[in-house]
């Protein structure tokens, strides 16, 4: 079940609900253990160490604090929840991914920085010009604009600096602009993803 869910979202750290804990396995466990300074353990204790499955976990009731720390570091987290009561399950407990959290899609107040918007943006660029959209899904605030002409880059950078998005989705044309990518990553500490 875990491997099937992880295959659906290989770019996410998978928080897999097992009883009162969210568990991470394999490379996710190694990464989370290092990033959050958690103890790395393993399954299959009877096997040689090289064949054991690395794992680490966090209590489900305090998972938001751990997720917030991972999001602040730019990671994406997929939450895989138990969809039925384990006591009533016949065989494996049915599980499904109920939420994917990225730096720009945080909605839980405990994960948000007080007094600061949490914008996600989309930048579309082609030979005709540049389109730009900002949205803070925690407040519903949204802004859309476009730029053409010789001052388009200046306007684009001004708007990006004004809104300071936590995450940016870039079209192929925008992603191929090295200066734009550097500005977003190095100046704004923004997580990037490519959209087609």
What are the functions of these language-model segments?
Residues 1-195:
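Basic, polar low-complexity surface loops/patches
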